[in-house]
Design a protein with these regions (language model features):
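Active-site catalytic loop in hydrolytic enzyme cores
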Residues: 85-155, 168-170, 174-176, 233-250
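Short, acidic/polar
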Residues: 17-28, 143-150
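Extreme N-terminal starter segment of soluble prokaryotic enzymes
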Residues: 1-5
């Protein structure tokens, strides 16, 4: 299976325009035969906690239907970031689209302290069975909580995919955490991060994949939008941009 992570810049608070941009990256992943594609944390709004209350919606929002259509027609599982709400609370969520299945909302269970006054912690840990893999989704600060990756390990996850906002001063620490998660739990681990600015942060890019020894085996740069694809069978790494360039670096 080919697993893709998207490294993008989001437009602050503009769900409609961000959906348009997401569709371009989804189509690029489909062209490269990806079976899974995951975007950064709160990718459809940008990481903008102060706007979450007015932007929050739910998985059945009709604006998301074209993402579902692409999933259905192309057999791809897609994870996008979105603030969601119920009758009382607001959550940092990943909406998961699977072919011809009801959408899933996975909400961040372990919140960063500054998020706690605004958001409620999710209560429903999940893993996803996709082809021959078991995928554990994670949202940013969850990589700092051992209980999250321990749940993944107990449930026989093979892939750990973190949807994050990691900024310039925090990227090295986040990369170390994900390397350790890979090594200590026998998980191929991924990080989908932003470039540009979001939430007042200068985002660091460097979206990455680590093998089960914790070795960094693929990484995008710190500035360019692109997708990073890993083939779980052949171990091939592919890097693509919308203009067709193949990104190159030392990984």
């Amino acid at each position: 299976m080919r697993v893709a992570i998207a490294q993008i810049a989001s437009i602050k608070g503009n769900i409609e325009k961000n959906i348009e941009n997401h569709l371009k990256w989804i189509k690029l992943a489909i062209q490269n035969n990806a079976g899974v594609l995951v975007f950064p944390e709160l990718s459809l709004t940008g990481y903008e906690p102060e706007l979450a209350e007015i932007l929050a919606t739910n998985q059945d929002d009709s604006r998301l239907d074209e993402i579902q259509n692409l999933s259905d027609r192309n057999g791809i599982t897609i994870g996008v970031g979105l603030p969601t709400k119920d009758e009382r609370d607001i959550f940092i969520s990943m909406i998961i689209f699977q072919p011809y299945k009801e959408r899933i909302t996975y909400s961040k269970q372990y919140l960063y302290p500054l998020e706690q006054p605004i958001f409620k912690a999710g209560k429903n840990p999940i893993v996803l069975n996709i082809e021959t893999e078991v995928v554990s989704p994670a949202i940013c600060y969850e990589i700092s909580n051992k209980a999250h990756c321990e749940f993944a390990k107990r449930n026989k996850a093979t892939l750990y995919i973190a949807s994050v906002l990691s900024y310039i001063n925090g990227i090295d620490d986040d990369m170390k955490k994900l390397s350790d998660i890979a090594k200590n739990n026998n998980l191929v681990s991924f990080m989908a991060n932003y470039v540009g600015e979001s939430g007042g942060y200068k985002c660091a890019g460097k979206s990455s994949v680590w093998d089960t020894t914790g070795k960094l085996i693929g990484q995008l740069d710190g500035e360019t939008e692109g997708i990073l694809i890993y083939d779980t069978e052949t171990k091939e790494i592919v890097k693509k941009t919308l203009d067709g360039l193949i990104l190159t670096n030392n990984k």
